A protein has these predicted regions:
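Short hydrophobic clusters on alpha-helical segments that form packing/core surfaces
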Residues: 8, 12-20, 66, 98, ...
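Hydrophobic alpha-helical connector segments
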Residues: 71-101
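Amphipathic alpha-helical packing segments from all-alpha helical-bundle domains
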Residues: 112-138
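Short, intrinsically disordered, charge-balanced linker/junction segments flanking boundaries
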Residues: 138-144
């Protein structure tokens, strides 16, 4: 994504976060978002279909960040010897990711879409653990 698009998406994101601090997501309009972001409505619609598409996009970006942290902290060799240390390192990295994105995570968890976000996050965590971390363990049941 080019720099201008990233800058515009960040402005939209920051505007949405600021508005979500003031009121519930379902009460926020696209007009309010574009006014706060200082962009045109047309620019908003170049990036998103509607505010729900925007929220879905932000949720997916957050889930991808968490997945990347988890996958980048799985040792490729000497898995058994490093497993305990790697779990610690992975948790530390997930907590860093949370710290860097705590405002968004807090707003996503308390928004009217929190059940959707939590389900997506749970599904992604389950996939990473069962398919990437423990792919050879059959019948591994997780309760996340």
């Amino acid at each position: 994504m080019d720099r201008r698009k990233r800058k515009t998406r960040k402005a939209i994101f920051d505007a949405c976060v600021a508005l979500m601090k003031e009121k519930e997501f379902q009460n926020i309009t696209v007009n309010e978002i574009v006014e706060r972001a200082d962009i045109n409505r047309g620019t908003f619609y170049l990036h998103f279909v509607d505010k729900y598409d925007m929220m879905n996009s932000f949720e997916n970006e957050m889930i991808e960040k968490i997945e990347d942290v988890m996958l980048n902290n799985i040792p490729k060799k000497q898995f058994e010897e490093l497993f305990i240390q790697s779990r610690y390192d992975t948790v530390v990295e997930i907590l860093k990711c949370y710290e860097q994105n705590k405002e968004l995570l807090h707003l996503l968890m308390r928004s009217s879409h929190s059940a959707s976000f939590q389900a997506k996050l749970r599904d992604k965590l389950e996939f990473v653990v069962t398919e990437k971390i423990f792919p050879n363990f059959e019948n591994l049941e997780l309760q996340i």
